[in-house]
Amino acid sequence: MSIPTTQKGVIFYENGGQLYYKDIPVPKPKSNELLINVKYSGVCHTDLHAWKGDWPLDTKLPLVGGHEGAGVVVAMGDNVKGWKIGDLAGIKWLNGSCMNCEECELSNESNCPDADLSGYTHDGSFQQYATADAVQAAHIPAGTDLAQVAPILCAGVTVYKALKTAEMKAGDWVAISGAAGGLGSLAVQYAKAMGFRVLGIDGGEGKEELFKSLGGEVFIDFTKSKDIVGEVIKATNGGAHGVINVSVSEKAIESSIEYCRSNGTVVLVGLPKDAKCKSDVFNQVVKSIHIVGSYVGNRADTREALDFFCRGLVNAPIKVVGLSTLPEIYEKMEQGKVLGRYVVDTSK
């Protein structure tokens, strides 16, 4: 298979600086890595943070962003096992980890202190060819629609793991804050497939319609509601058993603790800049509310999340555009005008 020496990609040289769609070198895989011809990549809010550099974690520079890449294995290092040329592979947020620390031993690889992150500390999937650690790369079944599966590799895995973390049972109410965005639209579907009743909170044109089309039961528009907490408690007959916070609003997180029912779990997923999680201690203790963070997922979570997708139980509402339009996508993200998930075609 002929592999070019240069490729199209989007790269920036300083955080918040210009995004260049240009010819860049094709990387060479290390002994433990795959070289993947990326066909499509989802665009995540994390990519926006990586570009801006507004998280308390330094990015590499220059940087090619992206961490929801779906493509074909075209080369591999000498130490790679379990893969062959032509396999479909996914590039995840967790590109690689040490596999030797306590967290890796417990299958919490995303919490590895030496984790290598796609599109952050490792050049990611906003290019036509990208490398990924063979252990962490996702096995995508043959025949899978690569554009459709791309968002599952981060957004899908992340919300699926968050729902597991909430430890609910079938028939319980889950409230999803940010229910019509890229993460939320998948969370609604995974929640339905897992047997939960779904209440969504979001605001803006078309969001209730999207939420209901995905199987959501009760929708609250925060731009119109005068009492979100009261409305959630009333609709769920006492409060949500679990809350999945995927919005990037500190106020939404604070409210979610108030409408979570006794012995329920509030799961923090979205990462608003400089946000604090504020909870009234008396209320939290007396109601025995759990507040936990959930950070992407491990290899088993990835396999399970992909299985839901391959069985037709979840379907990312995507809009496919060319990689060259990435700056415009970031602008829409900043304005909160994204419904579902943007996916970029690396050939355009």
Swiss-Prot record:
GO terms for molecular function: alcohol dehydrogenase (NAD+) activity; zinc ion binding. It catalyses: a primary alcohol + NAD(+) = an aldehyde + NADH + H(+); a secondary alcohol + NAD(+) = a ketone + NADH + H(+). Binds 2 Zn(2+) ions per subunit. Zn(2+) 2 binds at C98, C101, C104, C112. Zn(2+) 1 binds at C44, H67, C154. Its EC number is 1.1.1.1. The keyword NAD applies. InterPro entries: ADH-like_C, ADH-like_N, ADH_Zn_CS, GroES-like_sf, NAD(P)-bd_dom_sf, PKS_ER. SMART domains: PKS_ER. NAD(+) binds at G178, A179, A180, G181, G182, L183, G184, D202, K207, V269, G270, L271, R341. Belongs to the zinc-containing alcohol dehydrogenase family. PANTHER family: ALCOHOL DEHYDROGENASE 1-RELATED (PTHR42940:SF3). This is Alcohol dehydrogenase 2. It comes from Kluyveromyces marxianus (Yeast).
